[in-house]
Amino acid sequence: MSITFLIITCTSCSFEGTSLVTAGRYLWNDNGRTFQFDRRLGLCLDCNKVVAIEDLPDAETMERARSIRQTYVGQPLFSFIEPDYAKYLASQDGFDVLEQVIELNRQPVCLQCGKSAVRPINRPEGLTGETPVSLNLGHPWCSGTLQMQTSGGLRIGVRPETHVYNIHGRLISTYDE
């Protein structure tokens, strides 16, 4: 499978990262139960690089998902088809694992080192492969600002991997799909 990607650079130094770090499947596992969770692009202040970080649902979404879960019958829904994120979450196998993670009341963690010193990176409007767009995010290791652009027509072949974590965000295993 080949995909386009985003490129993150700094205006003042040679720092570079890509959105390819978010490729693959990410699972929480607890006592044999699993839940496939969402991740997003972030900057880890401990790893000093662009990484995948957990994307935890907010309290309102979780409350709605719990309510929907009580009466939901049917197969798990696909996130790219179901517009209601709470309904999507409620339909998923292993929802109890998600609830355990939320009950820990912890911050999202870096999915490389497991620490919570992360800053989410939001995709700005108007991205192209021609001119980088500012992320309005200072680069912590120099005086520069981070910027983003698309890979344009460049596509990279990725080998899908599954990453399995415990409910505290610590990596247990990684395997090829």
Task: List where the protein language model places each region.
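Short recognition patches in nucleic-acid-associated and regulatory proteins
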Residues: 6-97, 104-158
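Extended, charged low-complexity segments
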Residues: 142, 152-177
